[in-house]
């Protein structure tokens, strides 16, 4: 008779322990119920990127002096600079400039070391394509400014500022 009583007591203790664990999980769920959502509904909501965000590179053809500093400081020698030496004025003339964003690691060295500031980082981060050859941008594609998502009325922008805790 005693083994039956101890089994019944063990069963009761296990039931109480299971109910306590379920209650703890339920309390955690309820504590998260009144918080704001962490995720955003992309592409209908987009984050406003920070000021120092390193997105697609913007290139100004008229400012470039074809010095190839960007190629030398790039860790993967990515920018392709084609130029021709003009003997009458003894200067380089830029013919073609291209960057393959499928290979680019967006380190920002080319922008930082450019002596004429013809390169700059934009806030554009939507570079996905179905064909990797479309990621090879020439000077015309690099010269296009990205469309601002702030002016698009169909997209709700969300400012991503860190909360300051006191």
Curated annotation (Swiss-Prot):
It is an enzyme of class 7 (translocase). It is found in: Plastid, Chloroplast thylakoid membrane. Pfam families: Fer4. One of its GO terms (biological process) is photosynthesis, light reaction. Gene3D superfamilies: 3.30.70.3270. SUPFAM superfamilies: 4Fe-4S ferredoxins. GO terms for cellular component: chloroplast thylakoid membrane. NDH shuttles electrons from NAD(P)H:plastoquinone, via FMN and iron-sulfur (Fe-S) centers, to quinones in the photosynthetic chain and possibly in a chloroplast respiratory chain. The immediate electron acceptor for the enzyme in this species is believed to be plastoquinone. Couples the redox reaction to proton translocation, and thus conserves the redox energy in a proton gradient. This is NAD(P)H-quinone oxidoreductase subunit I, chloroplastic. It comes from Synedrella nodiflora. The gene is ndhI.
């Amino acid at each position: 008779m005693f083994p039956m009583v101890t089994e019944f007591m063990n069963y009761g203790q296990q039931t109480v322990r299971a109910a306590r664990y379920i209650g703890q999980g339920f309390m955690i769920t309820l504590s998260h119920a009144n918080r704001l959502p962490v995720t955003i509904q992309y592409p209908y909501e987009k984050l406003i990127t920070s000021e120092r965000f390193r997105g697609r590179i913007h290139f100004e053809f008229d400012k470039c002096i074809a010095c190839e500093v960007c190629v030398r400081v790039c860790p993967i020698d990515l920018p392709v600079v084609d130029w021709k030496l003009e003997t009458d004025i003894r200067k380089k003339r830029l013919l073609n400039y291209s960057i393959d964003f499928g290979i680019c690691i967006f380190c920002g060295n080319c922008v930082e070391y450019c002596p004429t500031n013809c390169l700059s980082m934009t806030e554009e981060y939507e570079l996905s394509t179905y064909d990797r050859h479309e990621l090879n941008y020439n000077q015309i594609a690099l010269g296009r400014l990205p469309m601002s998502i702030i002016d698009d009325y169909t997209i709700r922008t969300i400012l991503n500022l860190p909360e300051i805790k006191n």
